[in-house]
Amino acid sequence: MHNTTKRVTVPALEAMLYETIKVLDHGFIRVIDYMGDDSSIVQAARVSYGKGTKQLNQDKGLINYLLRHYHTTPFEMCDIKFHIKLPIFIARQWIRHRTASVNEYSARYSILGNEFYLPDPANIASQSVVNKQCRAGDSVPKKVSEKVLAILEEDARRCYRHYKELMNADEDGNILDENVSGIARELARINLTLNYYTEWYWKINLHNLLHFLRLRTDPKAQYEIRVYAEKILDIVKAWVPFTYEAFEEYRLQGANISRKGLEVIKRMIKGEKVIHETSGMNKREWEELVKIFR
């Protein structure tokens, strides 16, 4: 059967459909479907039909303008749907981005597989003393990381063993002991550790996806969600290359500067030597401003 379509397609993204992109030790990302491309954004912005007579460089310039000036609705005309397998503790962080449609694997209806995440020793670090929500930059000593991994694996395996015991069923749903009555799956699951994997379908428009990527590809984002975001960023690059370039230029590699920060820069341009004490900024704001220009 010969399939044809009148909708816009992107050859680079078509080649990615249903392909498994590995993430972490057992996770993955798969592109399931998408709608629109760079031309869809331009079309919506111009409120016209078809690609029209505009040159590609004009389309690119318009996309740059739209992103630079924080226009949102043209980017909402593009959608993409992913199938993602990820650790539960990352899923709970991910779902904070509420502007998406999500359908997750049900551990009330089905039995979770015996797959759990263990971090690479290089990514095991102590708590940061500067940022209360993330780890420090340096890895812990080898002896410490080995102990951490042993504890995580031991706890995960023990909890999964008890999970099966509580249900009186194995991973495939087979009864373990005919003389024992197991409890409901919705109750048995509460004993599992957060490093077990879940799966979901996640559909989101391009505007909200770019917001997700801006936050989750940031170096301060947790490593385990950042690696997913980086893979999705590569997908966006293949899907909407003009938008990706504008996003990189104005969001990822650009910087927001406060009113006080601008005043400091103006004073410096005029030749004045400005230090933290004379800047009118608090210590953290000053450090962030200095970091931009390093």
Swiss-Prot record:
Residues annotated for dUMP binding in this entry: Q93, W94, I95, R96, E104, Y105, S106, A107, R108, R189, R216
Assembly behavior: Homotetramer.
Pathway: Pyrimidine metabolism; dTTP biosynthesis
GO molecular function: flavin adenine dinucleotide binding; NADPH binding; thymidylate synthase (FAD) activity; thymidylate synthase activity
Requisite cofactors: FAD
Annotated EC: 2.1.1.148
Domain ThyX, residue spans: 27-250
Matches recorded under CDD domains: ThyX
This protein's record includes keyword Isomerase: no
Motif (ThyX motif): 96-106
Family that this chain belongs to: Belongs to the thymidylate synthase ThyX family.
Pfam name, any one: Thy1
Name of the top EC class for this enzyme: transferase
Catalytic activity: dUMP + (6R)-5,10-methylene-5,6,7,8-tetrahydrofolate + NADPH + H(+) = dTMP + (6S)-5,6,7,8-tetrahydrofolate + NADP(+)
Cofactor: how and how many bound: Binds 4 FAD per tetramer. Each FAD binding site is formed by three monomers.
Keyword Methyltransferase applies: yes
Name the UniProt record assigns to this protein: Flavin-dependent thymidylate synthase
Function: Catalyzes the reductive methylation of 2'-deoxyuridine-5'-monophosphate (dUMP) to 2'-deoxythymidine-5'-monophosphate (dTMP) while utilizing 5,10-methylenetetrahydrofolate (mTHF) as the methyl donor, and NADPH and FADH(2) as the reductant.
Coiled-coil parts of chain: none
Keyword entries, A-Z: FAD, Flavoprotein, Methyltransferase, NADP, Nucleotide biosynthesis, Transferase
